[in-house]
Amino acid sequence: MEVHNVELQISAVRPDQYPEQGYPEIALVGRSNVGKSSLTNTLINRKSYARTSSQPGKTQTLNFYRVEDQLFFVDVPGYGYAKVSQKEREKWGKMIEKYITSRKELKGVISLVDARHEPTDDDITMYQYLRYYDIPVLVVATKSDKIARGKWNQHESKIKKALDFDGSSAFQMFSAQTKMGKEEVWKWIEDRMGE
């Protein structure tokens, strides 16, 4: 998709704040600082539209980015950040669960993991949770440029094994630095939009 028009429509914490246009929605989930904002910026051809931060836990709302008046990217708060209080994590968890399990416009979830490391327990839990609810998932392994290309298959295999990856999901290595994987991610998104 050629992207020219993007707007942060709303940062929501409750269903009554969600957009009402009925556009397909693609949620981006992953632990704090895994690269959700960097992926979003790469997909929409912007350097810093979605705010990136070296401070984990920056996103605390569901951020609905309207793309070309055709779909929404929904940036979800990162999980697994220890400096956020347990109460705050529980609040985010309920907000995310309500969105994922009840939003009919949600057509798929891009679950980001760090390509350099095996998935965390939180990554595994999120992936299994999405599969349990039969939500289409694209696992995107970010920061792939930090790994020698000859080791990508090895890292992909470790990630898939840890997630107990199944054939109904898709997988893509990705780098915001080199834009590698951008077209494949867009293809997956466009396929979901047609469903």
UniProtKB/Swiss-Prot annotation:
GO cellular component, one term: cytosol
Binding site for GTP: 30-37, 57-61, 75-78, 142-145, 173-176
Source taxon at top rank: Bacteria
Residues annotated as domain EngB-type G: 22-195
One Pfam entry name: MMR_HSR1
UniProt keyword annotation of Cytoplasm present: no
Any one GO MF annotation of this record: GTP binding
UniProt record, GO biological process: division septum assembly
Cofactors (names): Mg(2+)
Keywords (A to Z) from UniProt: Cell cycle, Cell division, GTP-binding, Magnesium, Metal-binding, Nucleotide-binding, Septation
Keyword flag Metal-binding: yes
Family matches, as SUPFAM superfamilies: P-loop containing nucleoside triphosphate hydrolases
Chain's role: Necessary for normal cell division and for the maintenance of normal septation.
Family to which this protein belongs: Belongs to the TRAFAC class TrmE-Era-EngA-EngB-Septin-like GTPase superfamily. EngB GTPase family.
PANTHER family assigned to the protein according to its UniProt record, in alphabetical order: ENGB-TYPE G DOMAIN-CONTAINING PROTEIN, MSS1/TRME-RELATED GTP-BINDING PROTEIN
Identification of the protein by name: Probable GTP-binding protein EngB
Organism per entry: Pediococcus pentosaceus (strain ATCC 25745 / CCUG 21536 / LMG 10740 / 183-1w)
Lineage summary: Bacteria, Bacillati, Bacillota, Bacilli, Lactobacillales
